[in-house]
């Protein structure tokens, strides 16, 4: 996936439309397959529609497993800004997926709803586990539980690198 750092936003990452790989292309490929299926050009309609439905979930799961901290956000959301600032202030690297900048952001938000039970943003994952929104994340931080979760992930990733 191709991501570009936003200069004024610290470690905030946004989708770069100049890249040819990533969620937009994969989701567009699934949407194209579904359109072909609907027009009769595809012989296996049900599998094409399944691909369309599972593409966002697969991309979300891949992003979550590849990064210790992932924040699914919207650029205009004050709670999202608050959550990103918390991780920035803790000097923790994180990946942000700005749903409102993605062409298929609504499908990703629908997939996040199915995974977490909420449509609101931010949706925050640490060490592969959904921890909640901004309020939940701040509570974990105040209780002293957030940083240990992050460190646990970094330790796990460094051990994997040792054995590769």
Swiss-Prot record:
One of its GO terms (cellular component) is intracellular membrane-bounded organelle. The modification S-glutathionyl cysteine is found at residue 77. The keyword Ribonucleoprotein does not apply. The modification Phosphoserine is found at residue 20. Keywords: 2Fe-2S, Disulfide bond, Electron transport, Glutathionylation, Iron, Iron-sulfur, Metal-binding, Mitochondrion, Nucleus, Phosphoprotein, Redox-active center, Transit peptide, Transport. It comes from the Eukaryota. [2Fe-2S] cluster binds at residues 68, 153. Disulfide bonds join 77-80. GO terms for biological process: apoptotic process; cell differentiation; cell redox homeostasis; DNA protection; glutathione metabolic process; regulation of DNA-templated transcription; regulation of signal transduction; response to redox state. Pfam families: Glutaredoxin (PF00462). Glutathione-dependent oxidoreductase that facilitates the maintenance of mitochondrial redox homeostasis upon induction of apoptosis by oxidative stress. Involved in response to hydrogen peroxide and regulation of apoptosis caused by oxidative stress. Acts as a very efficient catalyst of monothiol reactions because of its high affinity for protein glutathione-mixed disulfides. Can receive electrons not only from glutathione (GSH), but also from thioredoxin reductase supporting both monothiol and dithiol reactions. The absence of GLRX2 dramatically sensitizes cells to cell death induced by doxorubicin/adriamycin and phenylarsine oxide. Belongs to the glutaredoxin family. Monomer; active form. Homodimer; inactive form. The homodimer is probably linked by 1 2Fe-2S cluster. This is Glutaredoxin-2, mitochondrial. It comes from Homo sapiens (Human). The gene is GLRX2.
């Amino acid at each position: 996936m191709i991501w570009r750092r936003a200069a004024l936003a610290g470690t905030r990452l946004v989708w770069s439309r100049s890249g040819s790989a990533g969620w937009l292309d994969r989701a567009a490929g699934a949407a194209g397959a579904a359109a072909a299926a609907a027009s009769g050009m595809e012989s296996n309609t049900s599998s094409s529609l399944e691909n369309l439905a599972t593409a966002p979930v697969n991309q979300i799961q891949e992003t979550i497993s590849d990064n210790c901290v992932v924040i699914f956000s919207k650029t205009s959301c004050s709670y999202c800004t608050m959550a990103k600032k918390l991780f920035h202030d803790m000097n923790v690297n994180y990946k942000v997926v700005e749903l409102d900048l993605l062409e298929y952001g609504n499908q990703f938000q629908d997939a996040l709803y199915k995974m977490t039970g909420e449509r609101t943003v931010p949706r925050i994952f640490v060490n592969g586990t959904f921890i909640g929104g901004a309020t939940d994340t701040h509570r974990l931080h105040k209780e002293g539980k957030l940083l240990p979760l992050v460190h646990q992930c970094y330790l796990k990733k460094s051990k994997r690198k040792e054995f590769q």
